[in-house]
Amino acid sequence: MTDATPDYKDTVNLPQTTFEMRANAATREPQLQAFWAQHKIYETLQQTNPGEVFILHDGPPYANGALHIGHALNKILKDIINKYQLLRGRKVHYRPGWDCHGLPIELKVLQNLKPEQRAQLTPLTLRQQAKEFALKTVAEQKQSFQRYGVWGDWAHPYLTLTPDYEAAQIGVFGEMVLRGYIYRGLKPVHWSPSSKTALAEAELEYPEGHTSRSLYAAFEVIELPQGLAKAWYNALGKLGVAIWTTTPWTIPANLAVSVNPDLTYALVEVQPSERYKHLIVAKDLVERLSDTLGRTLKVVATAKGADLEHSRYRHPLFEREGKILIGGDYVTTESGTGLVHTAPGHGLEDYGVGQRYGLPILSPVDENGCFTAEAGPFAGLNVLQEGNAAVIAALQECGALLKEEPYVHKYPYDWRTKKPTIFRATEQWFASVEGFRDAALRAIAEVKWIPAQGENRITAMVAERSDWCISRQRSWGVPIPVFYDKETGEPLLTAETIAHVQAIIRDRGSDAWWELSVAELLPESLRDQADRYEKGTDTMDVWFDSGSSWAAVLGDQQADLYLEGSDQHRGWFQSSLLTRVAVKGQAPYKAVLTHGFVLDEQGRKMSKSLGNVTDPREVIEGGKNQKQDPPYGADVLRLWVSSVDYANDVPIGKNILRQLADVYRKIRNTARFLLGNLHDFEPEQDMIPYAQLPALDRYMLHRLHEVFSEVTAAFDSFQFYRFFQTIQNLCVVDLSNFYLDIAKDRLYISAATGDRRRSCQTVLAIALQNLARAIAPVLPHLAEDIWQHLPFKTPYLSVFQSGWVQLSAQWQDNALAAEWQRLRQLRLEVNKVLEKARAEKLIGSSLEAKVWLYVADSEWRDRLAQMNPRDALSGNGVDELRYLFLVSQVELMPQPQAVDVPYVLEAEGLWIGVGHAQGEKCVRCWNYSESVGQSALHPQLCDRCQAALQGEF
């Protein structure tokens, strides 16, 4: 450039902003979190927002280790909802909680002790160490949750181990006692020999591939009821009732055989026969059993199950008799023989039959899972190992065994020790669900379940569930505040005793139960009888702990929302429902939202052995190899949460995170462009009124109204993936690829304060502020970063104080939108031809091109003619085809192929030609124009740029 050539660089309005192109999340996100904390943004909004209170009640995670990706999904979903509600002006109350008692924490403590330390362990020292472990874990997890950008009352979380919480829980228990819902009874429960404790349903898992030794056996029938055909009585002497079981070890506890009253049973002749010449089996199973047993079974006579009731048989291993009794719908012909071996001490259905017929509850198995003396020759043997084998051998020896075979099925395991459980009758404390089941089912129907199928799931579970065993034989938990008479074993549990213990626990915590004497724990009126009583040693099921959280946190209020994984239909949702309905007669929640589990990119469960675990900390901070696993920051993790359909199981992995980081960058770069081009814009004085805006800008406001209305609907319906898709589409398709692409010419080369530029800045300012608000629930750090870089003043310190998106009804213009959709479609067609010309090097930039255009529709042609003024200065400088297509010139043709050009696209009613633009290139705007060279003062500029320098374009 010679001295004589003017430099127009300083006359161009280039973007200016200190907003970084890169997020630098590792440093920037903690700075923004410190800003929120310093200015108490959450605390202030929680109190000063004008709207109603919104309570999302936190399901307490278990305080026994580092957080996994499922925790991140859960807590971020909650935070998205809470932040949206804050932006909508509601007073959000969110008090995070932790589940701090129970066996997993006990096990962690025990694992860290040497054998001699374990031998000397008292309940109080174990409890002290368990408490220390839980509190340390809570502190670590709290830090992680806060790093995710999750807001809440972190200074006052609820912990199930604090005295006020434990006292509230004792209060719930006491209310249930007084209403007659708590009882003590001998009943089969899921018993874990490996943990030596009873387990609730929620503490079981059913791994694939468990193989049991199943067997078919026959018990000798010695008496039949009257009214059967003669053939039945003729068979006595060598007649067996055939049963099938997958738990041979329960045969010593057999007291009955159950039939279905409505099924047809057959008396079959066995060929070849050994001990039994005849067997009783379900008629529909004769053929299948013939194959299984390897014998011919010939039907001799039939009878209904109801007709076999009260038949008597001899136990094959013990000197006692049993009866054929009526069972329930669980007796089917799907497997086995159609007759069910019944041991009331070892199964819930068996227990139900036993209760109906007044059978004793025989359970000859101790807490270690070994046979007791009641099992005679099997005493001392482990029922799941050598005890099982010994029973099978004994049945073989006495001729009762018909067949043994391996059986693969789902079997309950202890979720903590990963060892099999058994059903075993023990003295336990129960909540009688029967007493309030109907009320619970009515309460379920009044709740909004998201997704809707959650209602069917929990309804079926509550309708079918048995009474809830709430006692545990562990030290680390809330004590069941019961005293037992030393002589009679009678429990002492009254309103007075419970209230007294509750007051002590509120004051001193539950350690007091172990620290204080019986005399100190009894109320004044009973103190002189202290020698008669001893303290109970059972603690409450941890599901009763967390299920009482409504009492400790909500009091009489109902939460607006509970939100947890879909496994909580049988866990926390249910335990909370049952305790609240029992005490208050209503559900603790108005709505319940569930999410699926997190899988890897191939849809597999995560496991260390597969090496497919995504650690949320690594997503945020990066892995050991930061090139391979870069630090994406919390916002990218949160963007992932918004992108998945959480109603199902959701995938995550390196490829997914890379794609999300790319989407995040696009949103960030869009915001950076908007910020940079508003550096000299003051909304109060520079905004152009809606009526004076060019059509393109009014169309863009229509699109913003559509987009942000869709985002609002997405948040209102908890469909965050719709937010993700809509915002991504706005930033990429509507803004970057369309509006901002066209806007650069207006923003950079127009007169700085001219309407052509200010009208565009008006749209940018509206888009930017609403974009920041709309992404704030999901991308709070990015939204706040944008807000802190706004080049103009607003009344709000933080984006979260600015409220939700602000839209005007007048922006909606469907006719205008329809026209611009058609124009955008035309632009896409023109771009196809421009791409062809660019690929073959006719042009570099599209500004080097001229477009020739023919449309057959005469009305449309007239409209396009209005958008194609004769010269650069006679239109409005915005709503023109040359700007829409990003070319230097457009010529409308009276007919197709009226000009010979190198690049053409022909379609129905449409012809597009592209050639090189006419005239010279303007050094300032890079458009080609025949006006370049005509000005003596600015010979290198086009007429537009000359006018812009005069402040007229």
From Swiss-Prot:
Binding, ATP: 608
CDD domains cross-referenced by the UniProt entry: Anticodon_Ia_Ile_BEm (cd07960), IleRS_core (cd00818)
Cofactors required: Zn(2+)
Record text on cofactor binding: Binds 1 zinc ion per subunit.
Sequence motif: 'HIGH' region, positions: 61-71
One of the protein's GO biological processes: isoleucyl-tRNA aminoacylation
Enzyme Commission number(s) of this protein: 6.1.1.5
Reactions listed under catalytic activity: tRNA(Ile) + L-isoleucine + ATP = L-isoleucyl-tRNA(Ile) + AMP + diphosphate
Motif ('KMSKS' region): 605-609
Keywords: Aminoacyl-tRNA synthetase, ATP-binding, Cytoplasm, Ligase, Metal-binding, Nucleotide-binding, Protein biosynthesis, Zinc
SUPFAM superfamilies, alphabetized: Anticodon-binding domain of a subclass of class I aminoacyl-tRNA synthetases (SSF47323), Nucleotidylyl transferase (SSF52374), ValRS/IleRS/LeuRS editing domain (SSF50677)
Domain notes: IleRS has two distinct active sites: one for aminoacylation and one for editing. The misactivated valine is translocated from the active site to the editing site, which sterically excludes the correctly activated isoleucine. The single editing site contains two valyl binding pockets, one specific for each substrate (Val-AMP or Val-tRNA(Ile)).
Family membership: Belongs to the class-I aminoacyl-tRNA synthetase family. IleS type 1 subfamily.
NCBIfam families named in the record: ileS
Record-given protein name: Isoleucine--tRNA ligase
Gene from which the chain derives: ileS
